[in-house]
Amino acid sequence: MHVSQDHFRRAALEIGQSGENDTLPYDIDAAFIRDRAEDFSGICFTLFKAIDAKSRKDAAGYVNELTIGAERLLTPSGSHGFRITTRIHPFWNLYLNGLGIAIAEANEGNRSQRAHSYRLGGEAPSYFDRKRSWRTYKEATLAEEALKAPGSVIVQTDISSFYEHIYHHRLENV
């Protein structure tokens, strides 16, 4: 997989356009990251190169020693509920989003055409294909041939709280 400074720059511009995540209101940090996209992307890429130059064992040790600041926030969920959201430090949000864009770019050709979530293909400042959305997913699902059979059922679930329920120890040891 190829990672470049451009991946981090694109992440900074996307954060500046859309905010840090889809559960929190737009924060002034996002505009600051966008305005300093070149500076921050350079810092992120320098860090990436330093980690990438280490052996796998040393890189894992280095990353495991990092402290990534985060806040746990109660955010509205629907019209009558709340959920816990984790907001990581803006720098780490940018760094991880840059790596995410590099991974997505490398993997996009392998993804099913039936997938609708966060597909690359947009132009700056939003790099995601806005024609792929929750709404288009639901419309495509309702148009499925299999649903025309008598007794067909659609089961809809919400996995937005999955992070709270996974066993993190296994993830830490991957």
Say what each PLM segment does.
Residues 1-174:
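Conserved two-metal-ion catalytic palm core of "right-hand" nucleic acid polymerases
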